[in-house]
Amino acid sequence: MRRSMPLAQLLPDIPQARDVVISGLVMDSREVQPGDAFVAVAGFGAHGLCFIEDACARGAVAILFEPPAPQGVSVPDGAIAVHGLRARLGAMADRFHGHPSQAMTMVGVTGTNGKTSTVQLLAQAWHCLGVRSATCGTLGVGLYDQVVPTGFTTPLVLQLHQCLAQLRDEGAQAVAMEVSSHALDQGRVDGVHYDVVVFTNLTRDHLDYHGDMEHYGAAKARLFAHQDVQAAVINVDDPFGLRLLHGLAKGMRRVGVSVCGHTDADVMAQHLSLNLQGIGFDLVIGADHASVRSPLMGRFNVDNLLAVAGVLYALNYALSEIAAVLSTLRPIHGRMNRLGGQDGQPVVVVDYAHTPDALGQVLSSLSSHVCGRLICVFGCGGERDRGKRSQMAVIAESNADVVFVTDDNPRGEDGDGIVADILAGFARPNVVKVQRDRSAAIAAAIGIASAEDVVLIAGKGHERYQEVAGVRHPFDDTEVARRVLAAMSAQETVR
């Protein structure tokens, strides 16, 4: 049954809101249902006022808009002007849905890399500890193991509060949420109550949006200024994280995590061991320590596990419980997923690494465990930060023995132009293998690999599509790699 509420409870200072009862708050006219209030604010393409006719035809009982109206766009009689409407939406949605984030343990995770892995691993840890958990992020929104894709890392503000209300109503006790810099800059998480917030790292990404690293970092830092946050878990090995830690508000619990033995750390990993079967380390909290043996691959997954450990520590779990549950956590789809490696086949690893730092970390993690060659397949997304393309080329050339450059998601950009931007970063572009057909590139990379080699397929990870000219075609790196490996096995059997 749909909720209803007098609009005056959400806008008590607006006289026109009296005597109107609404059943929902909606910003997309195509999603309006009878009884909803349609919220018209400026978007990236057009102002919401351009879609009032559609909203009214679908049954909107109130039109809320943020003045001034764009030139040439008429405002219908009865539309309610609300100054500062966008900034009020979070509080309005939170109240309309009955403050859902206050009914659950809420953890927000921000940072350039590691958000998805940390969120998914935390939800998995809660599940293992008997807590009914849910996630919100790149993979979608839903209870643990029941995630539905949304298309956003962090949903838009009205949609987000609606999702949180649904999770609460479905019995979620704890929610792990990715919080992107775009979401923080655009107010998508306004009105959300967080118990714990997490910072993973800050490296180059999204400069097409933020302009420079200073503004990018400032957007991330907004999460730590949210009202009523009880604790902050921060990677103090990251220089920006250390600055963040020392700038936290008084009274907020500070949990520094470190692999490097930083003096500001409360939770540390020591005596690391890494191989293609997994990672091991001693988890240290204060004077106590416990052993962790995890099937996850890669040095950076130690950081992700430490972030999870930091959250559980902030929520008052004991060291023994934390170490035990970390050892049970399984790999996440599209994050350092390992295939092959048997019957003379090479090991194939699929990972979402799509930033210079992430690609460098994955290649570095794999290179120390490869007996033969490290072969890398990667591309760069279209209509995104062009500056990182040449940087990723430098990293691939420095860390891999063989490099295939291919298409990622060209989107509306010319694929040949993207490849040219990437090749400009190679010192020896003539030895780079260019194959824009991603399936063919994956097949070629696996085809030249021996049993001692490792093939990294980077950039798309969990994605099950490839976006070309505005159309998303079915595509899954993992499935393509599986088919290639299966075909190799079949050929060996015939021989």
Swiss-Prot record:
What GO molecular function annotation could you give as one example from this UniProt entry?
A: UDP-N-acetylmuramoylalanyl-D-glutamate-2,6-diaminopimelate ligase activity
Record has Ribosomal protein as a keyword? no
Q: Where does UDP-N-acetyl-alpha-D-muramoyl-L-alanyl-D-glutamate bind?
A: S29, T153, T154, S180, Q186, R188
Under which pathway is this protein filed?
Answer: Cell wall biogenesis; peptidoglycan biosynthesis
Q: Where does meso-2,6-diaminopimelate bind?
A: R384, D408, N409, P410, R411, G459, E463
Pfam families per the record? Mur_ligase (PF01225), Mur_ligase_C (PF02875), Mur_ligase_M (PF08245)
Q: Which cofactor does it need?
A: Mg(2+)
Location of this chain's protein in the cell:
Cytoplasm
This chain belongs to the protein called UDP-N-acetylmuramoyl-L-alanyl-D-glutamate--2,6-diaminopimelate ligase
